[in-house]
Amino acid sequence: MKDILVVGKLKEGKFEKFMGFNNSEEGMNERRKIADVTKSLGTVSPDKSAVMFKIVVHDEDAMYSFLDGSNPVSKPIFDEVMESYEIFELNKI
C-alpha cells in the first residue's frame, strides 16, 4: 500500500457535483477498489475550485483509471467536473 496525495482542480461551479459522486454508493464502490477509504483524508480550497485527498492506495492502476477517464463509472462525472489533477507519492520521514 502507498500513501498518495491527489490534488484536483475543478471546473467552475462543479464542487457539489464532484462531492455528490464521491459520496454516492457508486462513487464509494469505485473508491474502495482503489484505496482504504477509512484512511482517506480530504480538504477543499475556500473557493471550492480545488480538492486535495491523501489516500492509502492498494491498486494504483485502478487509481489512474479512476482519474484519467478510462474507468467507465467515473468518466462521465470526471469529464464534467475535473479540469486537471496532480498525483504525488508520499514518503514518511
Predicted feature locations:
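Short, exposed beta-strand-loop hairpins at the edges of beta-sheets
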Residues: I77-D79
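Short S/T/G/P-rich N-terminal loop/turn motif that feeds into the first structured element of a domain
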Residues: M1-V73, E83-I93
